[in-house]
C-alpha cells in the first residue's frame, strides 16, 4: 500500500504573473499539493487564477512589484491562512494545513539580501511559525550545511540557530541558484527549515524545470492530508429520477394521522428518511472524479519543449557552459511564447462559444457573475484577545461566540414596561376562525417558483430535489402543513441554521465585526414560512398596522419611490426658500437585536391565534452554527433577532417597527411640513420651514420621540453613524440636533439608498462616484470587452446593457434632474465604452455608434425610464407614492402646487427633458 504523501514545491520566480501558465503545468505534471513561491513580485490587487488551487500572497511594504512571497495550496485540502508578515527585511506568507496527525504550518519565506540578521531575529521568526512547521524559501544565506562552498555572515547566524535549537535543514546539497552572470558561482540559497518532524519522513529533490535562475525543489512529506468535506445535496447529480419518484410514490403513506406536536415531528422525520432511502437507491453507480478530469493535456510541442529544456538545464548545471545557458534561455522564451499562444487560443475559443441561451448553460452570464458580486476572502481573523485564529475551527468558534452575543436583546426598556409585555402575552385569546387550509395547487405553485440553484440547509434537501417530488410526496407535505397550521406548532425537527459569514463591502477582512451573517435554512422550512407569510399578508390588521412610509419588504415598492419622496420634499423647500432639516438614522444591528417578547406583543393584536402560536413557536429553541473552510462551530442559541435569509424575517421586522413615531410626533409644524421615509432599517426624517430654528426644533422633537420609542422597545441607535444634512441654497446650516444626548455630525451630503444627496441636490458628488465605480467595473472586465478579442459584438453589447449600464442608471428617474453638465459625464462614459467594445475609428460619430449598436442615448434612456416609472406611480398601491406621479401632480388644486422659482428640473419634468 502506497504511503500517503503531501508534495511541497519551492521556487524563487521573480514575477509570478508572467510565469503563471508554466507554473500551472508544473503543478499538474508533478501533482503538487502546496507550492511555496518567493520573489513573486505581486502588488496589492493583483491576482492569478490557478484552477483547483487557492493562493495567498504577501506583498512588499513599499507597494512596488518587488520581493513578496506566495503560498499556493490545493483547494480541496483543509487549511487556514495565517496573517502575512511584510517588512523591509522579510516577507512571509504561510498557512496551517490539516493532517491526520495534527496541523502543520507551511511557509514561503523571502529574506532580501543586504539586510543584517542576528540570532534573536531568526529565533523570533521561527517562534511565530509555531512548534510544527516547514518553512521553505530564499533565505539568501550561504553555508556548507546546505551545499555552499563557503559561508556568509547570515548563513553562519542561521547555522548557529539551527545547530543549537530543535530546527533542521532540508536541502539537496546541490546549488539552486545559477546566475546569468558567468562570473558568479552557483550557490544553494533555497532550502527548507523544518521543526517538529523526523527527517526520515521527508525527502527532497531538485527539479531542473521552470524558467528562472533558481531551480525548484520538490519535497515529499509522508503524512495524510485532511480534505474539506465536499459540497453535497440529498439527490446526487446523475441520479435515476424516475426510480426516485417511483420509490417515493410507493412508500409514502397518506393515511397517517397527525394530531399533535409529536406527530408532526415524527411525520417530518419519516418523510426525510424516505427521501434519503429513495436518493440512495437512485444514486448513479459511478461518479466522475472531478480532480482527475481536470488534469492538463499537454500538446506534443509543449511536452517536447519541456523535456528538451529540462535536459539542457541539467547539462548547464553540470558543466556551467555559458553557451548552454544561452540555449536554455532561448528554449525558455520559446516555451513561454508557446504557452501564451495556447492560453490565448483557449480564451478565444471560450469567448467564441459564449452565449446567453440555455444551449450553452447561459455561459455568458455565468462568466460575468464573478464581477457582479464581491468575493469573501479566506483571511485570518483576530480573536477577542487580540491574537490570531490559527485554525478554521478557531475561526468558526470566534464567529459563533460573536454572533451569540449579537443575537441577544438589549435591556433598555423600563422594568414596568417589560412586565406589562410579559403579562399581555399570558392573556388568553378570543375565539377566531382558523387559517385558510393549504391546498395541493398552492404547494405546486410554490414549488414551481423555487430557485433550483439555492444552497441547501443542513438537511441537504435542496430546491432541485423538491421540484422533482411526485404528487404523492407533495400531498404528504400538504397533510403536514395543514396539521402545523391547525396545531400552531413550528416543527423542531431541524431548527438549526447553518450560518456563513460574508464580508461587508469596503471593510477590513481581519476583524470579526466586518462580516455579516447569512443563514442557510432548510428548504422545507422556507416553504412553510412562505405559506405562513401568505396568510399573514392577507390580514387587514397587518396591512393597516404597517405604516405607509415603510417601503421596505413590500410588493411593488422600491428604493426609487422612497428616494423620490425625499428629493421631492427637499426640492419643494428649495423652491419656497425654506430650510429642509434632515436626519438619517442608523439602527445598530437592527435585524439581529429584535426583542422577541416585544415583537410577540405587537403581533398578538394583529394575528389570529393559530398564526400567533406559529410565530411564537418559530422563535422557541432556535439554534445556529457557523460554517467556514469546511469546519462547523458548536451549536449556539438565538435569543433575539429575525433570521437573515428567512422568508418571515423581513415582515416580522416591519411589524416590530410598525408603531415607530410618525408625523404626529411633531407638534410645531403642519403634517405636510414633516416627512418620514423608511426602507427596512434605513430611516430618513425631514422637516422644513422658512425659519431655520423652527425646522431644527421640529426635527429635534421627532428625534426625542424616536429615542423614547427606541428605549421602550430595546432598540439601539448608533449616533456615530447618524447624519444631519440641511437642504438649502443658503449658506447657513441648521443648528445641531442630538439623540440620546449625542450631537449628530452635520454633513453636506449623505448616501441614502445608494444615492448621494448633497445639500443643494445637484447630484454632482453622486455622478462623480458613478464615474469611479464604472471605471472600476470596466477595468475588471477589460479582457471580455476588448475590441480585438473573439467575443461577438452582440454579446459585448449585452454585457454593457445588462451588467455595466444598470449601475449607471439606477435611480436615474431621481438623479436625472441634475444639470446637463453633470449628465454629460454619463454620456461620455457610455460613448467611450461603446467606442471601445466596437473598435470604431476616431472619426465615427458617437450617435452613429449608438444607433448601430441599438443603445439608446442618455437623454432617450432618461425619458424611457421616467415614462415607465411614472406609469407605475399613477397606479401604485401606496397613496404616498401615487402623489408623486404626473397624473396626481396635474390633478392637484392650483393652491397646493408648488410655484416654480428656480431654473431647475423636478423628477416629473424628465418625461419631456431633452439632452443635446
UniProtKB/Swiss-Prot annotation:
Cofactor or coenzyme needed: Mg(2+); Mn(2+)
Question: Which stretches make up the Reverse transcriptase domain?
Answer: 483-757
Basic residues bias: start-end ranges:
896-906
Write down the EC number: 2.7.7.49
Regulation of its function = Inactivated by sulphydryl reagent.
**Reaction it catalyzes:** DNA(n) + a 2'-deoxyribonucleoside 5'-triphosphate = DNA(n+1) + diphosphate
Give the matching InterPro entries: DNA/RNA_pol_sf, Endo/exonu/phosph_ase_sf, Endo/exonuclease/phosphatase, RdDP_mobile_element, RT_dom
Task: Tell me one Pfam family matched here.
Answer: RVT_1
The name under which this protein is listed is RNA-directed DNA polymerase from mobile element jockey
Q: Which gene encodes it?
A: jockey\pol
